[in-house]
Amino acid sequence: EKIPFTKLLNEKGIIPGIKVDQGVIDLEGFPNEKATAGLDGLDKRLAEYYELGARFAKWRAVITIGDSIPSKACIYANAHSLARYASKCQQAGIVPIVEPEVLMNGTHTIETCNMVTNKVLKIVFEQLHMYNVLLEGIILKPNMIISAIDCPVQADVEKVADLTYACLKENVP
């Protein structure tokens, strides 16, 4: 007898989920910046995934730090798509994992990462509120506040912890 995989998982106490974004695309008019694709047809896909047993979904938005980026347009475009995705998930009975990720590539300092992540989280939560997303019904998957991989000065773990905690406390309702 063939047992659906999701049923097997449920019997083991495992709740299945699925990544629903369709990767990143170039943000038109904004060189070196990306937006996440996948909102087209998402309602239909979520209904199908729910029927198949998925109870959570993941959507990742990437924000790059570099010369004059991220732009306000990039932050808003990604926050907007995260909020629309989260709203659609909740309407479908699926818990959204909201992942606004400020990338660690580059040479930026921990202070720059902190500044950008604070802006990003503030705008993401404004957009989630605008789309009537029940915040208690999401899982936030944020980045840590860290120095970029190629930054000549790497912050110690205490500074990473302190700035990450302060950023989350300041911006997450």
Which role does the model predict for each range below?
Residues E11-P16, L52-R55, Q90-P96, H129-I138, ...:
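Short, well-ordered coil/turn segments that N-cap beta-strands
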Residues W59, V98, L140:
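Conserved, mostly hydrophobic/aromatic
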Residues H108-P173:
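Active-site capping/gating regions of soluble enzymes
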Residues P31-L46, P70-Y85, N118-K119:
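Glycine-rich anion/phosphate-binding loops
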